[in-house]
Design a protein with these regions (language model features):
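Catalytic Walker B motif of ABC-type/P-loop ATPase nucleotide-binding domains
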Residues: 160-163
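Short helical segment in ABC ATPase nucleotide-binding domains corresponding to the A-loop/adjacent helical element
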Residues: 98-106, 116, 120, 224
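The feature captures the beta-strand-to-loop junction immediately N-terminal to the Walker
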Residues: 43-45
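Conserved signature/switch motifs of ABC ATPase nucleotide-binding domains
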Residues: 134-137, 155
């Protein structure tokens, strides 16, 4: 893959050495290209390397083999070009909402007036304009994830990496956050990669959806889907009524179920 623009993952493999002298092949020969502005969800059974892949893209881990390039430059470590949103917001609880969102720009030496303007705009965008001076610990889980999204965007990343950011939320809050992610994707034009264990969420929040298989972690199948674009303008509950949604949901659930059964069979054979 030689395309300079976007995110390129080339022949990526990751092996973890174990204390007993053995090793675990977490990822093997992963190849992928994302154009700037694409929204991709990544799904698969536990142990398929989803989070490992995201951590390598973020620069938190160095791959055993292969490389990742963003806009033609090799990823060698963490960078403001790649923002991360975790399942738990990882916010500074002793700071106000405003201070959390403005922390990154402040560390970069951005002028105070520019920070205030950016923070105000982002908090209005995520629906927290009336909570700017609140302490983070006063907010609900869903509101904290909105702060985490705004804080990520404040750093101006080209790529937003989301590691199961909605997994701990109740159903109603989760649906509202899914709609917000789609809104931000369309308004900002950012490239977004979202890891999830939910087939439904992967379908709704991925114009491209990767299904990964385990042992070793690899890309098993890729789908191109219409639901994310539909969800920008429609209620997500209406999107779920789309006939192709039910068809793909059952297909992918069956695929992952078969993977889980295969894993259990291997474990029983080894015991």
């Amino acid at each position: 893959m030689t395309t300079d623009h976007g995110l390129n993952i080339n022949n990526l493999s990751m092996r973890f050495d174990l204390p007993n002298g053995g090793s675990v092949q977490a990822l093997k020969n992963v190849n992928l290209h994302l154009k700037s502005g694409e929204l991709m969800s990544v799904l698969g059974p536990s142990g398929c390397g989803k989070t490992t892949l995201l951590n390598i893209i973020a620069g938190f881990l160095a791959p055993t083999e292969g490389e990742i390039q963003l806009n033609g430059s090799t990823v060698t470590g963490p960078s403001a070009e790649r923002g991360m949103v975790f399942q738990q917001g990882a916010l500074f609880e002793w700071m106000s909402v405003r201070e959390n969102v403005g922390f990154g720009p402040k560390m970069k030496g951005t002028p105070r007036g520019e920070i205030r303007e950016t923070v105000d705009h982002l908090l209005d965008t995520v629906g927290l304009g009336d909570f700017k001076e609140k302490a983070v610990y006063e907010l609900s889980g869903g509101m904290q994830q909105r702060v985490a999204l705004a804080r990520c965007l404040a750093n101006g990343p080209d790529v937003i990496l989301m590691d199961e950011p909605l997994g701990a939320l109740d159903a109603l809050t989760r649906e509202k956050m899914q709609s917000l992610v789609l809104k931000l994707w369309k308004e900002t034009g950012k490239t977004i990669i979202l890891i999830t264990h939910s087939v439904e969420e992967a379908l709704l929040l991925g114009e491209r959806l990767l299904v990964m298989a385990p042992r070793p972690g690899r890309i098993h199948r890729e789908y191109r889907l219409p639901f994310a674009d539909l969800g920008v303008d429609q209620d997500l509950r209406e999107v779920k009524k789309h006939p192709e949604y039910a068809e793909k949901r059952e297909e992918i659930l069956s695929m992952i179920w078969d993977m889980e059964e295969e894993i259990m069979g291997r474990m029983e054979a080894q015991s």
